[in-house]
């Protein structure tokens, strides 16, 4: 869990873990409310507007746009991305608890590359990202930071829209944006 504290304003970001985002947010708020009752040190009040539950299972799942990955050289082609993912699905991903949950959500076991292509959004929401990430990015550990920065620069805004929209609407960032706009004028 990552927290950005800015005086008494903060934004807590949590992986979606393939679960109901609203319920995860409520659980997180209740957890911190309970901790405040038990601890001597007062923690800041965690309210729903301070919590962003990621749309995807984990942050890593935001980095699986085959077109961008091809442009970066992470995969040879978009088709190679889907072929590799399907190969790993058949090999072991379908046996993971998140893979079983994905199959349950879909109502069928994926049997082809076209199934992978058709359900990429569900894969990013319900399949554990750490496993997927290592398949494609594991060999780039030494260049990881640079590679991810380049990925973010190349990716369309909509790939990160739930994160960027939440930040855009967060009070601290809205006021900073207004300050920056004033400086530009």
Q: For each of these PLM feature ranges, what is it?
A:
Residues 1-185:
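Acidic, divalent-metal-binding catalytic cores of TOPRIM
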């Amino acid at each position: 869990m990552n927290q950005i504290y800015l005086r008494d304003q903060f934004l807590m970001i949590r992986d979606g873990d393939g679960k109901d985002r609203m319920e995860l947010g409520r659980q997180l708020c209740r957890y911190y409310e309970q901790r405040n009752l038990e601890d001597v040190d007062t923690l800041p009040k965690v309210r729903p507007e301070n919590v962003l539950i990621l749309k995807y299972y984990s942050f890593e799942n935001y980095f699986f746009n085959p077109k961008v990955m091809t442009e970066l050289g992470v995969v040879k082609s978009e088709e190679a991305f889907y072929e590799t993912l399907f190969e790993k699905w058949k090999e072991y991903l379908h046996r993971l608890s998140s893979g079983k949950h994905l199959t349950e959500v879909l109502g069928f076991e994926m049997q082809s590359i076209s199934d992978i292509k058709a359900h990429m959004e569900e894969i990013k929401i319900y399949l554990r990202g750490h496993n997927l990430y290592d398949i494609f990015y594991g060999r780039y550990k030494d260049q990881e930071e640079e590679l991810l920065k380049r990925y973010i620069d190349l990716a369309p805004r909509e790939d990160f829209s739930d994160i960027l929209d939440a930040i855009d609407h967060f009070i601290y960032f809205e006021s900073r944006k207004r300050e920056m706009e004033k400086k530009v004028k």
